[in-house]
C-alpha cells in the first residue's frame, strides 16, 4: 500500500509538515509506504476551466507544474492525505488551487481510493477547513 501526502503549507518545516512526518512514521511502523509532496512557497495557477486537460492533454493540466506530478503519482497511490495550515478559517489557497486542477484533470486517478485530511491551526477554523478539504473526497467518491 502507498499513501501520497500533500503539504499545502508554504513552510516545508512548519506545523503541518511536522504533523505529516508523524503520520509518515506511523505508516512506516505499519509497513505502509508513504511520500510527502511539499507545495512550498511556489505560486500556483487556479484552474481556468479551459478543458484542455480532458479534450487534448489526456488528463494532464495545461500548466506543467506539481499538479501533473500529483496526477502521475496518484495513478499508483492507494490513498491520500491532504494537509494545510488554517488561514482565516480556510485551507491555504495554494492547496485548493492544486486540488481543483488535479481533481478536474485527473479525477479518475483519485476516485474510489482512500482519502483523509489534516489541518493545523493556532486558533479557530479547523472544522471549516476540514469540511472544505473533505468535499474533494465526497465529490470524487473517495471513502
Segments from the language model and where they lie:
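N-terminal beta1-alpha1-beta2 submodule of the flavodoxin-like/Rossmannoid cofactor-binding fold
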Residues: 1-105
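Short, glycine-/small-residue-rich phosphate/pyrophosphate-handling segment
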Residues: 93, 109-143
